[in-house]
């Protein structure tokens, strides 16, 4: 007779932390320079005028203004721009 109960092992029991991706500032909203507009994996949204592209493909405002989303070109690329308010 065994004196210890046989202990099984599981290959589950792990989970990754949430990455909080997505659009942070929507079209028509005011934004300050340096603020994040979109956090993404890859370029689902492409930078337009007044928008910078970070090392992890994060889009951020280069100027103060209003956010504009548009679809451009034959490839129907979704572009994000920041239009400076006069």
Curated annotation (Swiss-Prot):
To which protein family does this belong?
Belongs to the bacterial ribosomal protein bL27 family.
Pfam family membership, one = Ribosomal_L27
Cite the SUPFAM superfamilies for this sequence. Ribosomal L27 protein-like
Tell me the protein's name: Large ribosomal subunit protein bL27
Q: Name one GO cellular component term.
A: cytosolic large ribosomal subunit
Which HAMAP family does this chain map to? Ribosomal_bL27 (MF_00539)
Q: Which domain of life is it from?
A: Bacteria
What is the originating organism of this protein?
Xanthomonas oryzae pv. oryzae (strain KACC10331 / KXO85)
Task: Fetch the InterPro entries from UniProt.
Answer: Ribosomal_bL27, Ribosomal_bL27_CS
Q: Which UniProt keywords apply?
A: Ribonucleoprotein, Ribosomal protein
Which molecular function GO terms apply here? structural constituent of ribosome
Q: Which PROSITE patterns does the record cross-reference, listed alphabetically?
A: RIBOSOMAL_L27
Q: Which GO terms describe its biological process?
A: translation
């Amino acid at each position: 007779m065994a004196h210890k109960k046989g202990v099984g092992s599981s290959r589950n029991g792990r989970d990754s932390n949430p990455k909080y991706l997505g659009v942070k500032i929507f079209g028509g909203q005011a934004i300050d320079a340096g603020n994040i507009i979109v956090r993404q994996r890859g370029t689902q949204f492409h930078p337009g005028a007044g928008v910078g592209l970070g090392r992890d493909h994060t889009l951020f405002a280069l100027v103060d203004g209003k956010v504009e989303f548009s679809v451009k070109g034959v490839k129907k690329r979704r572009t994000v721009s920041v239009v400076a308010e006069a």
